[in-house]
Regions:
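Generic C-terminus detector
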Residues: 364-368, 373-423
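Active-site "cap" helix and flanking loop/linker of ATP-utilizing ligase/carboxylase catalytic domains
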Residues: 246-268, 285-354, 366-367
Length: 423
């Protein structure tokens, strides 16, 4: 089979490495891919949002199956365009990808169908939002309606911060048209959990849970990033909580999308808060998370391509989706300065992958015979083990074997999970 993967980050590298385990896969193309992915797939310099060029390439190469990984092409209708040419795809159509593409849509969906989430208000005018904030409880959460590279959510701990966030989104157009509507919602407390789920539009098969570390610096200090590391499973996410989430969140969400005429097929990401009142949805994503994918897929024992094809064909009920009982840890190596200004072009020397350790390449390109940094988040250094403490230790040992002079990591990925295990 010839497989096409749209995207070019660490998440896509993890997907490609897993797809390669299927013996029927003869060739994988990555559009655009990156310098590290080039070891595992044929990279083609076509942008992930250039849907006409992606479709032309897929037709020309007679692609048997496509995986559209990033949010932008999903929201823009890449799956619709490929399906129209008879190419089966893993990923939702545009009318279902709106569950991530519009925070207003997703909040209204949850309200309509009784799916637990934070209380909220929607605003299209900055002055009305600012007037509302004068009496809103603080801290509060301000969200841009549209896609904003994972940076469109501000937790404001003072009224001044909240007003500033509204002005930057709605008046200064920090996120372009994505901030022309905003959601202001109640600040929830409790442990956060990420759960990715395979779905064919009816059946839901949750993956192993994970814990993200979004802040740039140790002890959850600094600004929000796309994610500085992950561990799986998340010790706060017990079997009992998993059952509650399946009954009150996962299945109702998929049923709600069907009822709205927007059947969702692909990977549905649930960002959850385990509040004193029970699990609530913080956000939905219409695709695999990054870097959650880098810990979840190494623990998948079932064949990824088979599961993806079942999601696309509506036959997920017939497929066994199994995960190992082990643990995984991914430590992101970023360019110094990320998520602010950083330098690119720093040479990278990486250890070889082995049975329990891998490096997923995100922001890097080939230069001459080697790799150099070419982004903020550069590498996802991952290890798997029978237990979480060992996985964390192995991941940091592997970080120590990477030559990346301009790289930095958080030193405490997994520390919160370890505390939870000790309770």
């Amino acid at each position: 089979m010839k497989i096409l993967v749209v995207g070019g980050g660490g998440r896509e590298h993890a997907i490609i490495k897993k797809l390669k385990e299927n013996a029927t896969v003869e060739q994988i193309f990555a559009l655009p891919g990156n310098g590290g992915i080039a070891k595992d797939a044929t990279c083609v310099p076509i942008g992930a949002k250039d849907i006409p060029a992606i479709v032309d390439f897929a037709k020309r190469e007679r692609i048997d199956f496509a995986v559209v990984a990033p949010d932008d092409p999903l929201v823009l209708g890449a799956v619709d365009a490929l399906n129209a040419e008879g190419i089966p795809c893993f990923g939702p159509r545009a009318n279902a990808a709106i569950i991530e593409g519009s925070k207003v849509f997703s909040k209204n969906l949850m309200k309509k169908y009784g799916i637990p989430t934070a209380r909220y208000e929607v605003f299209t005018e900055a002055e009305k939002a600012i007037a509302y904030l004068q009496s809103a409880p603080i801290p509060t959460v301000i969200k841009a309606d549209g896609l904003a590279l994972g940076k469109g959510v501000i937790i404001a701990s003072t009224r001044e911060e909240a007003v500033s966030a509204v002005r930057s989104m709605m008046e200064d157009k920090q996120f372009g048209e994505s901030g022309s509507r905003i959601v202001i919602e109640e600040f929830l407390t409790g442990p956060e959990v990420s759960v990715l789920a395979f779905t064919d539009g009816r059946v839901v098969r949750p993956m192993v849970s994970s814990m993200d570390h979004k802040r740039a610096l140790d002890h959850d200090q600094g600004v929000n990033t796309g994610g500085m590391g992950t561990v799986a499973p998340n010790p706060y996410y017990t079997e009992e909580i998993a059952k509650v989430c399946m009954e009150t969140i996962f299945l109702p969400t998929v049923a709600a999308m069907n009822a709205e005429g927007r059947p969702f097929q692909g990977c549905l990401y649930f960002g959850l808060m385990l509040t004193p009142d029970g699990p609530k949805v913080i956000e939905y994503n219409c695709r695999f998370g990054d870097p959650e994918t880098q810990v979840v897929l190494p623990l998948l024992e079932s064949d990824l391509l088979t599961v993806m094809q079942a999601c696309a064909s509506g036959t997920l009920a017939d497929v066994d989706v199994r995960f190992s009982a082990g643990s995984a840890c991914c430590v992101i190596m970023a360019s110094k300065g990320y998520p602010g200004k950083y330098e690119s072009g720093c040479p990278l020397t990486l250890p070889e992958d082995d049975a329990d350790g891998f490096i997923y390449v995100a922001g890097a390109k080939q230069e001459g015979e080697g790799l150099v940094s070419a982004g903020g988040r550069v590498l996802g250094v991952t290890a798997v083990a029978d237990d979480l403490p060992t996985a964390i230790q192995k991941a940091y040992e592997r970080v120590g074997r990477v030559d990346f002079a301009n790289g930095y990591t958080r030193s405490d990925i997994g520390a919160r999970a370890m505390l939870a295990l000790q309770k």
